[in-house]
Amino acid sequence: NDRWSQKEFTMPIRKAIPSDIPVLNHLLEQVLLVHHKVRPDIFKESGRKFNDEQLKTLMSQENTPIFVFENEEGKILGHLFCIIKEPQSLAQTPIKTLFIEDLCVDENARSQKIGEQLCHFAEEFAQKIGCYNLTLDVWNDNVAALRFYEHLDLKPQQTIMEKILKK
């Protein structure tokens, strides 16, 4: 059951450009807050994952595309940060993977299928560039995100185990 390929969306999704950086920063702050609520021991309440120069660098590199979802009024309502990975290990099959580094829909625009459209776009993009698979990380305590990705037919690939040593 491949849900993403069943529909063709006319998606208002484009590559991010430097003038999008203020909105990307705002969305990244929303992601950080979600992660902080799930794991306050690991994530700060506020801060920046990337500075503006790092965002410009990511935008300019072939293997780290950033896409934005822009509505009819030109307002950016979501983003998709990707990393194109190819294993360097001799023990691994040489497959290309599209890793979703970050996906966010603005908190004021949720429940409008924007996240689904971004995921569908990611899958189509991955297929177009010859990827074997699409992967992402999700925190186990982020139940809403887990359900969202399961609904889109993503399956667990591996589990990172943890034992907290400092209380």
Regions found by a protein language model. Give the residues of each.
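Conserved acetyl-CoA-binding loop-helix of GNAT-fold acetyltransferases
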Residues: 102-105, 111-124, 151
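Conserved active-site alpha-helix within GNAT-family acetyltransferase domains
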Residues: 116, 120, 128, 140-158
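Conserved GNAT-fold acetyl-CoA-binding loop/helix
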Residues: 32-55
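Conserved GNAT acetyl-CoA-binding A-motif
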Residues: 126-137
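Conserved beta-strand in the GNAT
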Residues: 68, 75-84, 104
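A short beta-loop-alpha structural element at the N-terminal edge
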Residues: 12-26, 35
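Conserved beta-strand-loop-alpha-helix junction that forms the acyl-donor binding cleft
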Residues: 135-145, 162-166
